[in-house]
Amino acid sequence: MELIINLSYYHVADDVPETDSDIAVVIDVLRATTTISWALKNGADSIQVFSDLDLLKDTAKKWDGNKRLMLAERGGKTIDGFDLGNSPLSVTKETVQGKRLFMSTTNGTKSLKKVQNVEYLFAMSLPNRKAVAKRIISLNKKNVLILGSGWEGSYSLEDSLAAGALAYYIKENYNSEVNILNDELQASLALWNVWKNDILELSLIHISEPTRPY
């Protein structure tokens, strides 16, 4: 028997109330969860995220230097002393295959840590939205929390677009009722419905605005 799925979305980690969600989906399109998705696709063994850089370093040192990579970014820039930043272009198959990645970013890792204790946790970006949606449907769980990462505590257009894309795909493909629980997700779903055929155009308009580093 398929359960009713309840979907909610919050823009940033600080907005999330106490929750009994079965599933959490964290989105940081620019760029943590996009990088995580590509790294795993390219053969990374696993990825561990940290808010604290010193803890990241101490943990990474316990691993064979040939089988680990340290990734860290603050304010859109790679931090000195780390192997990589948070660009998806850097996590090539040749670079990450078979390695454990230790990662810290300005926004995405904060959201991942916020919901780390849920039963099922997904890192989603636009390219893997359908795969995440299919997996959520197959799990047949009731409460799904979608969490954006924003930019330094503020709203992110691209995260909300991705949240809307996820909700749209679940609604279109789930054989039972899907409840949209809050205005944040209703707005994100509307955003996706307007722009789903012109994602590139929206991205170019958004990135052309010099509001933050990419």
Spans of features found by a protein language model:
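Short active-site loop/helix that positions an aromatic residue
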Residues: 35-42, 59
